[in-house]
Amino acid sequence: MPTAPAGFVVSSYAELPSPRMMVYAPNGDLFVSSPASSTITVLRDANSDGVFEARGVYAQAPPRGAAPPPVAARTGGPGAGAPPPPGRGAGPSILGAAAPACAPPPAFAERGPGTLGAPFGMAFHDGYLYVGNTGSIVRYKYATGDMQAQGEPEKLLDLPTGGHSTRNILFNRAGTKMYVSVGSQSNNDAGEDCRRAAILEFNPDGTGYRIYASGIRNPVGLALQPGTDTIWTAMNERDNYGDDLVPDYATSVKDGQFYGWPYSYIGKNYDPRYVGAFPELVNRAIVPDVLIPAHSAALGITFYTGTRFAQRYRNGAFVALHGSWNRSVAAGYKVVFFPMNNGRPGPIEDFLTGFLSSDGANETPIQQWGRPVGVTVSRDGALLVSDDSGNRIWKVATAR
């Protein structure tokens, strides 16, 4: 059983295969994505007592035709599907004085029939459930109380595939803009599709494409800071530079800004492969708000908007750290918290630990029995944590 600070109680909320992201429907049903089986499950707590009474499969891809299971950031070691190591791709010798411009394929936002393929992020908006597949954004017509999809989804746009596979979705408070996170194809190669290593902005119907922010290697979690339209992301940085480089991070995301990848990290610190490249671009690289130990694999992020936790947790953020595969001593495998004071983040602290079954030193693979992925605040003010290795959702509530 994972361990939370004194005053909290941890329990198993649900058991289901490889749960990843979670989102609440307008009526309080909890929707859970499982990319490995291309399934979306719905859990219903009709009497709001914090225990679900009904469970159903909202949507599932056919056995044949579903997208292959995604390779999540750092989930099993540097095998098939892992980001390539340094030494491949464009190097500084071919880089010019200005960052290259690019345009996505002209028909990438062409609407049409859709399907489910390794779904990850989800969002409810204006009578639809939006789903981030690895290779597309689709939406299902949704009526309050639906436990099963009303037919096949509509595809709004295509996304590049390969490499980092998670696609998350977030709407602004007015519901006028949709934001989609797309990770890089490689570890740190230049010259990728400009829709990658970025947060993209669209209208709710998939039109109006633009790059909202770039240079973010693998932005996985997305959340709005309470009371604002400020986007925050939890992000996986690059590998193969030793145990302590490069730190992962959680950060607010500023419109039109560049966050360094692949040319630099933590602002203007050059990646060894690109020293001297694109100085004007690197000079304006943003320093992230909250640094997280390297290779922790920061995935889900949510702000605490409930009222059951102590005041110090209000409007602070929880981040799920999925855990490392390439450190001499394991990092991550826990949920961390950082408070917000006058809109600024404080230092991170452990919140939910105990997912490692050893000290995590010099092990391949790491001996663990759980890996946190998604975090969300339940309707009764608890924190839910999905665990795709332990195949369950954990609930952290205040002790009564």
Predicted segment positions?
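Beta-rich catalytic cores
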Residues: 9, 18, 36, 54, ...
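Short coil/turn segments that connect the beta-strands within blades of beta-propeller domains
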Residues: 27-28, 126-127, 174-176, 228-229, ...
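Asp-box/WD-like beta-propeller blade repeats and closely related beta-sheet repeat scaffolds
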Residues: 54-73, 96-125, 134-174, 181-184, ...
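Blade-level signature of beta-propeller repeat domains, shared across WD40, Kelch, NHL, RCC1
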Residues: 373-400
